[in-house]
Design a protein with these regions (language model features):
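Transmembrane helix-loop-helix hairpins at lipid-water interfaces of multipass membrane proteins
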Residues: 1-37, 61-115, 196-200, 302, ...
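Hydrophobic alpha-helical transmembrane segments of ABC transporter permease domains
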Residues: 2-3, 66, 74-78, 84, ...
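Juxtamembrane helix-loop junctions of ABC transporter transmembrane domains
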Residues: 26-43, 66, 74-87, 108-155, ...
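A short amphipathic helical element positioned immediately N-terminal to and/or at the very start
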Residues: 43-57, 158
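An intracellular "coupling" helix at the cytosolic face of ABC transporter transmembrane type-1 domains
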Residues: 55-59, 147-148, 164-173, 177, ...
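Helix-loop-helix
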Residues: 91-100, 193-207, 277-356, 361-362
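ABC-type nucleotide-binding domain
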Residues: 363, 370-371, 377-632
Length: 632
């Protein structure tokens, strides 16, 4: 075997250098921008933030580390025991001795299996708790984002961050980190064991490391790119599905099913191609590493067999059949962790990429935040004042231009105007759904920016243009999961707003199921439920945004009756399409292009024959035309 020393030494030296290179390639960071993973956060920063979530569970990780030592010990010791058993079998041996060695091996195997099982159970439970905490933090943070920010971020993207990306992170806690450490120590331990057993054969094994390094570096480059494509395509298809499933009725109305199907097919095919590329990369890497493993085994069998037959020895150590068997097992245990390290590192980078996406949402500063000296609003009279308020959704494109008006407590004020005049925007600003750029908005003489947002919104009952009902029951949608509200109180409120007239006809009453977005109820029924939901929380100011749009005449009469009753609750601000519903308002404010052009009572504005008169006349003639068409 000494004849092969020059080749073995050269190969081993190259192997050691290559091992250092692979460590540098996989461990040393190459800056923030990495191939296939465009990132803005450093790995160390991401890891630190992830560890902050793991810190409360450090005891569990200590136990896992202790259990992992048994698995590492088994991987290192078991080949030596099997080699010893093989030597006993081929030579003269006592049956008791063989039994003791076999029993010892079985005991170590059982202990290792038990440790691996408990390690997996602890990691799964701990990892899921960590990810559950992260998801909760993410959801709570999303709830704090302003309306403007929620409008900018697609719903599908938020869903992907909360589900797919957190699942990718969970893999790191349940598998990757522990196995990365385990594989690293197994490689070191096996290398030391092989050197201790026979360094000549160890040199032979090291000769194959340069090829593993080459394959791993190439694999790293392409696999990370493939990971990124899969993630981007997954986010894209989730966003598309979220949007188009919500708008499926529009798709059907305009007969766009085929066109939408083609778009979905394109996105689905893009995801399929990305996944195929990922499978192809892994499918090439694994056989190549397996080929190196087989090559090293063949070299072991040739060199080991030749040395065994020739009785070659080194430093007085004879090359035995048991040693060859041990090395055969060591080679398998040496190559598997190296292959796993390459793959697991890329999965880890994928988890880091997902973590950065999650943290990018968590790092979004809510645009609506309480001022440091914000006060708690205990009770309000309902006096509202706008003082030269300017607002724009897009910088420079003013939606409101110097709007000023005053609302006395208990008054009912209506806002009218053409689409885009700023009616709904005014109502959104009062509740601080958006932040205005100039001027002041006062509630009982207090600037709303000096009031805590939660405290402010508790005093307002908001009914937005699009009435949103959650999946659940009528009861859960009215109380919004708030405890302490009895069914009697709920029915009293429903009776107050005339919602009981259709609830009592339902098979399950308050327990009637509500499907997604309340699509099993009519627009008018959803509006009445929205009234009940608002009133039951006892607001001081009622905000009705286009409350009587798109409903039947019978339900409109019920809603008008409800609105008359609600005037007694407190200050009421109304935006309505049908001007007939606001004739009894204390004051009507007419807006055009973001400015107040008229204000007064219904009769005063009609007498002035200005913008309100034009809108009212136009709507009156349209309603008369609709009635005549209906008679025909």
């Amino acid at each position: 075997m000494h004849n092969y020393y020059p080749i073995l030494w050269v190969g081993a030296i190259i192997g050691v250098i290559s091992t250092l290179l692979i460590v540098a390639a996989f461990v040393v960071k190459d800056g923030k921008k990495e191939t296939g993973f465009e990132r803005n956060m450093k790995d160390s920063e991401i890891m630190q933030r992830l560890m902050d979530y793991a810190k409360p569970f450090y005891r569990q990780f200590i136990v896992v580390g202790f259990l992992m030592l048994f698995s590492i010990a088994y991987d290192i010791i078991s080949p030596l025991i099997v080699g010893k058993i093989e030597e006993l079998v081929v030579g003269k041996f006592a049956l008791n001795t063989l039994f003791l060695w076999v029993a010892g091996y079985a005991a170590i195997l059982l202990v290792s299996m038990a440790c691996t099982y408990f390690q997996a159970v602890i990691l799964q439970k701990t990892g899921q708790k960590i990810i559950s905490n992260m998801r909760e933090d993410l959801f709570v943070h999303i709830e704090r984002l302003s309306h403007e920010q929620l409008n900018e971020i697609p719903v599908g993207k938020l869903v992907t961050r909360t589900t797919n990306d957190t699942n990718a992170i969970s893999l790191m806690f349940t598998n990757l980190l522990v196995n990365l450490l385990k594989n690293f120590f197994v490689i070191i331990g096996i290398l030391i064991a092989m050197l201790f057993l026979n360094y000549e054969l160890t040199l032979m094994v090291l000769c194959f490391v340069p090829f593993i390094v080459l394959f791993s570096i190439i694999f790293r480059k392409f696999s990370r790119r493939a990971h990124r494509k899969v993630k981007d395509c997954t986010t894209d298809i989730n966003t598309y599905l979220s949007e188009n499933l919500s708008g499926m009725k529009i798709t059907q109305i305009f007969n766009r099913e085929d066109a939408k199907m083609r778009e979905f097919t394109d996105k689905s095919n893009a995801l399929g191609r990305a996944q195929q590329e990922q499978i192809f990369v892994f499918g090439i890497f694994r056989p190549l590493v397996y080929m190196l493993y087989i090559s090293s085994v063949l070299c072991l069998l040739y060199l080991g067999g030749k040395g065994y037959l020739e009785g070659t020895s080194f430093l007085g150590q004879t090359l035995t059949s048991g040693m060859i068997v041990s090395f055969y097992m060591y080679i398998s245990k040496f190559f598997n962790p190296i292959q796993n390290l390459a793959e697991q590192f890329n999965w880890l980078q994928s988890a880091f990429a997902s973590a950065e996406k999650v943290f990018s949402i968590l790092d979004l500063e809510p645009k609506m935040q309480d001022a440091p000296d914000a006060i708690e609003l205990t009770d309000i009279k309902g006096e509202i004042e706008f003082c030269d308020v300017w607002f724009s959704y897009i910088p420079g494109e003013w939606v409101l231009k110097g709007v000023s008006f005053h609302v006395n407590p208990k008054e009912t004020i209506a806002f009218v105007g053409s689409t885009g005049s700023g009616k709904s925007t005014i109502l959104s600003l009062i509740c601080r759904n958006y932040e205005f750029q100039k001027g002041e908005i006062l509630i009982d003489g207090i600037d709303i920016r000096k009031i805590k947002i939660d405290s402010l919104r508790k005093k307002f009952g908001q009914m937005l243009q699009d009435v949103f009902l959650f999946s659940g029951t009528i009861r859960s949608n009215i109380i919004l999961r708030e405890e302490g509200i009895s069914d009697e109180e709920i029915m009293d409120v429903c009776h107050y707003v005339n919602a009981d007239q259709f609830i009592n006809k339902l098979d399950h009453g308050l327990d009637e199921p509500v499907r997604e977005r309340g699509n099993n109820f009519s627009a008018g029924q959803r509006q009445l439920l929205s009234f009940a939901r608002t009133i039951i929380h006892k607001p001081s100011v009622m905000i009705l945004d286009e409350a009587t749009a798109n409903i039947d005449t019978e339900t409109e009469l019920l809603i008008q009756d409800s609105m008359e009753k609600m005037k007694n609750i407190g200050t009421m601000l109304i935006v309505a399409h049908r001007l007939s519903t606001i004739q009894h308002a204390d004051e009507i404010i007419v807006l055009s292009h973001g400015k107040i052009v008229e204000h007064g009572t219904h009769q005063e504005l009609l007498a002035a024959q200005g913008r309100y008169y034009q809108l009212y006349t136009l709507q009156y003639h349209r309603e008369q035309s609709e009635k005549q068409s209906g008679r025909k």
